[in-house]
């Protein structure tokens, strides 16, 4: 399996932010939004990212954050698609459904937007597990 061309990542960013009071994926750690840590980790590992958000305002916000970051840094080597939850306010399962409907590969790794310290080793473990299932 060529992991660069056969795996997508769905990042769930559609939470209501009731407990935090603000959108978690755009919250900054050391002046860098959490979503960017995840995208940096995924670079050179997958073919596409589908970011699932809950409204058009967040689509614009995330698009601006990511576009500005790529303008100031090396661009990501995967495509990024922004989609709105098909079923609003029903939790992460509706985000997963929306994400799976919008990937172009057979498999999608699902990550929450508030996991900035996800390691490449974890992604590799998931890819290797998938490869073993397909052997």
Residue ranges and their predicted role:
Residues 2-135:
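Nucleotide and nucleotide-moiety/phosphate-recognizing core
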């Amino acid at each position: 399996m060529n992991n660069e061309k056969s795996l997508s990542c769905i990042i769930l960013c559609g939470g209501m932010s009731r407990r935090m009071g603000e959108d978690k994926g755009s919250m900054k750690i050391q002046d860098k939004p959490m979503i960017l840590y995840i995208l940096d980790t995924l670079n050179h590992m997958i073919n596409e990212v589908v970011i699932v958000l809950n409204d058009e305002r967040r689509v614009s916000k995330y698009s601006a954050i990511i576009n500005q970051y790529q303008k100031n840094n090396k661009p990501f080597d995967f495509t990024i698609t922004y989609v709105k939850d098909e079923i609003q306010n029903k939790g992460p399962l509706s985000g997963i459904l929306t994400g799976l409907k919008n990937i172009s590969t057979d498999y999608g790794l699902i990550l929450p937007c508030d996991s900035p310290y996800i390691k490449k080793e974890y992604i590799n473990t998931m890819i290797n597990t998938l490869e073993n299932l397909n052997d």
